[in-house]
């Protein structure tokens, strides 16, 4: 694994300070070179910081990640305010996913998708075949919502290993996907990436917020309006907690 760029504390999480181009190039370098050990990649936003502030186990997990990129615009703003001399750009998981799938230099990379529902995964694979014809999808798996047994985890690892996957994209929701990414990186010589809603966005089962809302930090209002029951706690509790965490841990 190439040396990771330095990290800087924003709230309760240590983030990799890079531009989008630097982040995707670092991932591409990983994927083009054989690995002897696994690598964990996280795309973290304000909600990840809020959760890490409340859960020390999750905080330790995130801060042990190999790469932790700034997935949310408010996190980028905080990084620029706290560390103005560093390179801070939004490294949005769905955008990074599309960049990697569509990069002709990565046509030999083998992709495995873990998470979401069977319907979404089928649509996702079909969409990738149409939009990114050079991308090699070697497998996908929709695990049950309950906690898997040890036997199920061993079977999962075996399927991934036998598929020859280079990268495993994990979309199990926060924080579950972050735990799974690090478990996979410890078990297999692959790159495991926690990309959240990227599955739904790529499969066109959930619409993304307009670009102007993403850039202005208002994406959360769009998502909350569309899914108030599911996302109310995430934003109405998480946003104030994020602000408190940033203030508490400022250098």
Regions found by a protein language model. Give the residues of each.
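Conserved beta-alpha
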Residues: 76, 80-159, 163
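A transmembrane-helix-recognition feature enriched in membrane-embedded lipid enzymes
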Residues: 74-77, 81, 209-251
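A short, gly/pro- and small-residue-rich
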Residues: 56, 60-64, 178-197
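Short, flexible loop segments at boundaries between secondary-structure elements
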Residues: 142-148, 189-226
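Short gly/pro/ser/thr-enriched loop/turn and capping motifs at secondary-structure boundaries
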Residues: 75-77, 176, 198-203
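A short helix->loop->beta-strand "cap" motif at the edges of active sites that frequently abuts
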Residues: 36-38, 109, 188-191
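N-terminal nucleotide/polyanion-binding subdomain common to many enzyme families
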Residues: 1-91
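Proline-aspartate-enriched helix->loop->beta-strand connector
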Residues: 160, 164-174
